[in-house]
């Protein structure tokens, strides 16, 4: 009997050891695979080698980037992988080519495609976009469009934590065709005038959470594109920039809508807009509904609350300036602070599909220490509590 117990105990220990070995993550140090922390040597192959090893393993993996500066060209990390737990732990800085022409026509600088269970923890991504911005300021369309710094597509269950993105050529972070993403403690910043550099852009995705982040950029701090649902944004400080924008929507005739969006406990400082919904002035099947803007502070914001359904850059392709996008069930609750312009609340909606079920609750916005104004066109809704400026709904 004693021998049987001993054999049984040994069997349990053996099984435990096997399970522990399977569960233990394997670490792949990019420096051990040839990456150089000098900011000059091309380390792209070393990063791809680390990814290939982690992706091919049945065990969870950690791709470790030590302190220092690592030069990367445009790179794609593709799945599917054999495990759903790969972490990029970045202690250093990844830097793009200083010559914007090297990656300027690539859609993305760093791109994850068809992956599941990837975490990016810490680190700095420097897109080196300053020279491209200068080119665009002088030469316009003759310059490359620029690369998004960090792109994700056709993926699930992604976490980005404590990451900083600097000086992107185009958008800083793009989330496209996703399920379940959490972004926390993200910092976005730029030096100088940086056109079309949205901080975080979300589209065709569901279950995205953006928490406790600071975004200073040359365009929207967060932009929300077609096909976005169940989006939660909380604890974001925005500025400078163009605010948090749903849209632009309705560029395409057949287009998925936006629904179930919450934006709360956010601060806008010196931004062009605060809480904005915008759609093209053209026919579309798009919509925006079930939107909650709650607990927002405005500090000298040009357009604190705005719906613009007559968006049409260069006045091209917008017959009659009539938007087909239907906007409904939008609540603004506890919005307060200062406007940099006299009109602090502006609802400029579609004459064909007026905005419906707009609700203002406990809104107090002032202009130069005096009452601001509101402006409504083709908008219907209600108010509750103290609402300043006086509602035009």
Curated annotation (Swiss-Prot):
Family annotation (Pfam families): Glyco_hydro_28 (PF00295)
Gene Ontology molecular function terms on file: polygalacturonase activity
PbH1 repeats: 115-136, 178-204, 205-226, 228-248, 258-279, 288-309
Highest taxon, organism lineage: Eukaryota
Active site per database record: 219, 242
Signal peptide: 1-23
GO BP term (any one): cell wall organization
Catalytic reactions on record: (1,4-alpha-D-galacturonosyl)n+m + H2O = (1,4-alpha-D-galacturonosyl)n + (1,4-alpha-D-galacturonosyl)m
Chief location of this protein within or outside the cell: secreted
EC supergroup of this enzyme: hydrolase
Keywords on record: Cell wall, Cell wall biogenesis/degradation, Disulfide bond, Fruit ripening, Glycoprotein, Glycosidase, Hydrolase, Repeat, Secreted, Signal
SS bond partners: 221-238, 349-355, 376-392
This protein's GO CC annotations: extracellular region
EC number of this enzyme: 3.2.1.15
Family annotation (InterPro entries): Glyco_hydro_28, PbH1, Pectin_lyas_fold, Pectin_lyase_fold/virulence
Residues carrying covalently attached carbohydrate according to the record: 260
Compartment(s) where it occurs, according to its Swiss-Prot or TrEMBL record: Secreted; Secreted, Cell wall
Function: Acts in concert with the pectinesterase, in the ripening process. Is involved in cell wall metabolism, specifically in polyuronide degradation.
Family (UniProt): Belongs to the glycosyl hydrolase 28 family.
Protein known as: Polygalacturonase
